Curated annotation (Swiss-Prot):
Positions of the t-SNARE coiled-coil homology domain: 190-252
Positions in the Cytoplasmic compartment: 1-265
Keyword DNA damage applies: no
Organism: Saccharomyces cerevisiae (strain ATCC 204508 / S288c) (Baker's yeast)
Name of protein: Protein SSO1
Gene this protein is translated from: SSO1
Phylogenetic placement of the source organism: Eukaryota, Fungi, Dikarya, Ascomycota, Saccharomycotina
Alphabetized GO MF terms: phosphatidic acid binding; phosphatidylinositol-3,4-bisphosphate binding; phosphatidylinositol-3,5-bisphosphate binding; phosphatidylinositol-4,5-bisphosphate binding; SNAP receptor activity; SNARE binding
Membrane topology: Single-pass type IV membrane protein
Keywords attached to this entry: Coiled coil, Membrane, Transmembrane, Transmembrane helix
Source domain of life: Eukaryota
GO terms for cellular component: cell periphery; endomembrane system; fungal-type vacuole membrane; Golgi membrane; plasma membrane; prospore membrane; SNARE complex
Amino acid sequence: MSYNNPYQLETPFEESYELDEGSSAIGAEGHDFVGFMNKISQINRDLDKYDHTINQVDSLHKRLLTEVNEEQASHLRHSLDNFVAQATDLQFKLKNEIKSAQRDGIHDTNKQAQAENSRQRFLKLIQDYRIVDSNYKEENKEQAKRQYMIIQPEATEDEVEAAISDVGGQQIFSQALLNANRRGEAKTALAEVQARHQELLKLEKSMAELTQLFNDMEELVIEQQENVDVIDKNVEDAQLDVEQGVGHTDKAVKSARKARKNKIRCWLIVFAIIVVVVVVVVVPAVVKTR
């Protein structure tokens, strides 16, 4: 799907590919990377589904804008609601999958690159979806205005805007119906405008959710960096503790050596005293005895 997206991101995403974890004899680290890449492949498949769902929503929007049969239009709206629900489910799933992939790759630059590619592609698809909704919203408003002008051709721009913005349009349209010359056509126009109004309410809700999702995915980068900073700080603290521990150990070794030297000196002094006693006391006594 191609849109004039001012926020389109140029980062290419990796094509998904399956890796057979069981057949790889590459050790624990290799198996970990294989498991991670299988997770990325699943994310890319879900991104493909999300892209397809957006295309379906866009196609149904265009068909609804040109459909004149009310029964067929009702069927199309039901299909549209189903695809919008599918898109919402995929958005929630992809957000969690990409967040998990970023956590798994926090220590590995290759994993980080793969997770970031998925995040960038998701952001682009969110923007594409916002453009689809925005275009449909504008077309809906224009059609609602044209329908209102059928029964109130002399209405001002403000009056038209108030009519299509009114919840249900009952109060304004009741007066318009009283003044209309062609009641049947006016009632048809009222039903059409009310249907458009409900579409506009859904679109506003969808666009608000997409904006919040886009902001959440942008903030994942900040959150990821904060996690890296915390880990780096913990590593630095651990290194400092090790260095301090080594310093304390060196001091202990020096103290032990000094204690041993003092102990040796004490024994030497004791030995010297014993020698002196022997020479001064014992030797003369032995000489006298002889």
